Amino acid sequence: MSFTIAIIGRPNVGKSTLFNRLVGQKLALVDDEPGVTRDRREGQARLGDLDFTVIDTAGLDEGPRGSLTARMQEQTEAAIAAADALMFVFDARAGLTPTDRSFADFARRADKPVVLVANKSEGRHGDAGALESYALGLGDPVGVSAEHDEGMSDLYDALRSVMPEPAEEVDEEEIVEPDMSRPIRVAIVGRPNAGKSTVINYLLSEERLLTSPEAGTTRDSISVELNWKGRDFRIFDTAGLRRRSRIEAKLEKLSVADTLRAVRFAEAVVLMMDAQNRFEEQDLRIADLIEREGRALVIAVNKWDLMKGGSARIASLRNDVDHWLPQIRGAPVVAISGLTGEGIDRLMIAIQTAYAVWNRRVATALLNRWFQQAVAASPPPAVSGRRLKLNYATQTKARPPSFVVFCSRADAVPESYLRYLVNSLRETFDLAGTPIRITLREKANPFAHKRKRKS
């Protein structure tokens, strides 16, 4: 029997748009007016290799008994009862409303797995609403734009976590690698005139993108599809990123915003540098942006054909990356020439490797064996004479690898100790160059309320 997921939420948050996106057809009417959907509608959805039944529901809204609104809610309740899991959708741009909070309680009472979806997350305006949603207690929000087909890979990860595992068992002693048959979305970014378009033209074997010695030739984020040695890629060429103080024209500001969106919705990002220029603060800012967005990073040093004594230059760049960007220590640095093709094969291999690391999941038994050894080798410092207890760790998601450490006092664990855990994780499981997220969470103390009563 097919796994069934009901899409729920208040009116006009984009449930029907998401439904249409998942089923691949415009089966549900979509309009800006709230309440267009009245009956529940079922469809067969496919996302990556996930096949499931999805139910579109009316917006959860209360009304008098017997009214149309009340009957719409009954239809929604029937869909929830029939579902194996729920997708709770809210509008990230509008933020949480009292109705969202009310029906988040409703979703919790259903006692079914819930995937929290922050729809309309395109651009920067959805960030605040997404962060606000942590207060609902329904887990990490998945930022998507159903209308623009953005964030679907993150939604895939979230749905995969609540759906039954395939019949084939994974050896718990193995590190789980991703399915490499899907196209890799790659954004190529960097300062103006680093040769981004020239590299893509070489890969395509045609003058697909305009190139010029003049900086700023590329304005839009242009996407192209290519197959390299049997592997599919979707590559986004982007406008060069200059320091904010140098950006004056409105068109350039729009180009920069377009580039930032390309980074946000890419899976791997190539930071292109000109070999003739020094590693500058703007390169660091771009790399830091890529890390904050949680994307796999490869650094490509272009125009290598113009350089002499190159091996020392590459070694120096690698040292600079590890020194200035310890949060992505070990990011691959590849020397290339978009004009002659030198190093292009190495670049494509580095992208695939970085993508695989970014997707990596570590088996729980293997993870906790590392965790016990890491804590035993270097226990966390005591705070005010009290020992901090770190209980266990679990991986919550990949893309990038994200972990939760359960402990006695989350607020007392110093940042330096978190960096120690990140570096140890990176070294033990060969996670070089990918962002690693560690969140601290306190284990509930069953006796806390009793102590409060006595005081």
Curated annotation (Swiss-Prot):
All residue ranges annotated as the EngA-type G domain in the record: 3-167, 184-359
Classification via Pfam families: KH_dom-like, MMR_HSR1
GO terms for biological process, alphabetical: ribosome biogenesis
Gene3D superfamilies, A to Z: 3.30.300.20, P-loop containing nucleotide triphosphate hydrolases (3.40.50.300)
Claim: Repeat is one of the keywords in the record: yes
Amino-acid positions noted as binding GTP 1 in the UniProt annotation, renumbered to this chain: 9-16, 56-60, 119-122
Signal peptide: none
Residues reported to bind GTP 2: 190-197, 237-241, 302-305
Keywords on record: GTP-binding, Nucleotide-binding, Repeat, Ribosome biogenesis
InterPro entries with a match to the protein in the record: G_ENGA, GTP-bd, GTPase_Der, KH_dom-like, KH_dom-like_a/b, P-loop_NTPase, Small_GTP-bd
CDD domains, alphabetized: EngA1 (cd01894), EngA2 (cd01895)
Domain KH-like: 360-444
Gene Ontology molecular function, alphabetical: GTP binding
Complexes and interactors: Associates with the 50S ribosomal subunit.
Similarity annotation: Belongs to the TRAFAC class TrmE-Era-EngA-EngB-Septin-like GTPase superfamily. EngA (Der) GTPase family.
HAMAP family registered for this protein in UniProt: GTPase_Der
PANTHER family (UniProt xref): GTPASE DER (PTHR43834:SF6)
Its biological purpose: GTPase that plays an essential role in the late steps of ribosome biogenesis.
Name of the protein this chain belongs to: GTPase Der
Organism: Nitrobacter winogradskyi (strain ATCC 25391 / DSM 10237 / CIP 104748 / NCIMB 11846 / Nb-255)
Gene that encodes it: der
